């Protein structure tokens, strides 16, 4: 994800699930694309990915195919009808829920090697502060935490921000 030359890498996180993180990520990606920017959205929720559903597209391959070595990162990318390039995460695959630091680092390196010329890479994180979320957020030049107006969402967002600023 070290596309520092021209690509802005934006991480969208939350302390708690169900606060609208994917909705914010998808809408940001589509809005930037509509403004004429070249945008890629990475669904980095390793076990419950659903950005492809929000974008209304079918993805024959996902991140699990890349991590297994079956496909390259470039081979799993799909272009949505909105023009956004999507790196689909995996959903319902148990091994993806326990991704290790080494695999997260491999994903970050794979993004750096992509030839795609993009202006914005939006990274839709899983909820919480897992090692994968922290690794992906560390690779982002801009970080946003989505929060709802309920006490547990606010408390979890605050805890997430505290952990993120320690990195």
Task: Give, region by region, the residue ranges found by the protein language model.
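Hydrophobic/aromatic beta-strand patches that form the interior of the parallel beta-sheet core
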Residues: 10, 85-87, 144
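Short, ordered loop/turn segments at secondary-structure junctions
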Residues: 17, 44-46, 82, 91-92, ...
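Short, conserved glycine- and acidic-residue-centered signature motifs
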Residues: 25, 100-103, 153, 157
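Short, high-confidence coil segments that cap the C-terminus of an alpha-helix
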Residues: 37, 118-119
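Conserved catalytic-core segment of NTP-binding enzymes
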Residues: 120, 125-167
């Amino acid at each position: 994800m070290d596309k520092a030359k021209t690509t802005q890498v934006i991480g969208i996180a939350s302390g708690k699930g169900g606060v609208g993180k994917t909705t914010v990520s998808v809408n940001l990606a589509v809005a930037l694309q509509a403004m004429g920017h070249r945008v890629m959205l990475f669904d980095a929720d390793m076990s419950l990915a659903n950005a492809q559903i929000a974008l209304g597209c079918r993805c024959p391959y996902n991140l699990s195919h890349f991590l297994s070595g079956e496909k390259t990162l470039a081979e799993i990318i799909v272009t949505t009808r909105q023009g956004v390039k999507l790196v689909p995460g995996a959903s319902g695959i148990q091994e993806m829920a326990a991704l290790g630091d080494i695999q997260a680092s491999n994903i970050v390196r794979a993004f750096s090697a992509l030839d795609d010329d993009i202006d914005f890479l939006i990274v839709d994180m899983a909820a919480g502060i897992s090692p994968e979320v922290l690794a992906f957020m560390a690779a982002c030049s801009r970080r946003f935490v989505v929060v709802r107006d309920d006490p547990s969402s606010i408390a979890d967002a605050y805890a997430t921000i505290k952990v993120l600023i320690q990195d």
